[in-house]
From Swiss-Prot:
Name of the gene this protein is made from: PFD5
Record key words, sorted: Chaperone, Coiled coil, Cytoplasm, Nucleus
GO biological process terms on file: cellular response to gibberellin stimulus; cold acclimation; cortical microtubule organization; mRNA processing; protein folding; protein localization involved in auxin polar transport; response to cold; response to salt stress
Protein name per the record: Prefoldin subunit 5
Cystine residue pairs: none
Species per Swiss-Prot/TrEMBL record: Arabidopsis thaliana
GO terms of molecular function: unfolded protein binding
InterPro entries (alphabetical): PFD_alpha_archaea (IPR011599), Prefoldin (IPR009053), Prefoldin_subunit_alpha (IPR004127)
Disrupted-gene phenotype: Reduced levels of alpha- and beta-tubulin. Altered development patterns and disturbed microtubules (MTs) organization. Hypersensitivity to high NaCl salt levels. Increased capacity to tolerate freezing temperatures upon acclimation (e.g. 7 days at 4 degrees Celsius) associated with a continuous accumulation of HY5 in cold conditions. The pfd5 pfd6 double mutant is less sensitive to gibberellic acid (GA)-mediated mobilization of PIN2 at the plasma membrane.
Cytoplasm in keyword set: yes
CDD domains in UniProt: Prefoldin_5
Amino acid sequence: MASSSSRGEMEKMGIDQLKALKEQADLEVNLLQDSLNNIRTATVRLDAAAAALNDLSLRPQGKKMLVPLTASLYVPGTLDEADKVLVDIGTGYFIEKTMDDGKDYCQRKINLLKSNFDQLFEVAAKKKSVADEAGMVLQAKVKQLTAATTS
């Protein structure tokens, strides 16, 4: 919940200012929710990659397998070097790493994303609180205004 000092500041604002504040806070909350969803999606993908690396490390060299080219297209292949993997570091760049380094990279990225998620979640909760508080103050002011004009 927003602090009492910010509520006091909101009560000093006019109706138009409160509407603008609420709209801005709602917009920021929506953007933060989108970012949280993107982080969640990236974390799920990295979890899948880490699981694939773990599965791959258990397979013997020379093992025949299906290699994914896309999400729905697989081609037959043979595991040539079971101790080396290519890691996508972004924007089309890949680095060859050992299996253990690849697993470690995935785990570090997952931890970073979870940390970012937690921080963004706190910011989104604060923004939502500000938006809710502005909405309540706005409703009270509108109710006051309608009561004053009808009496």
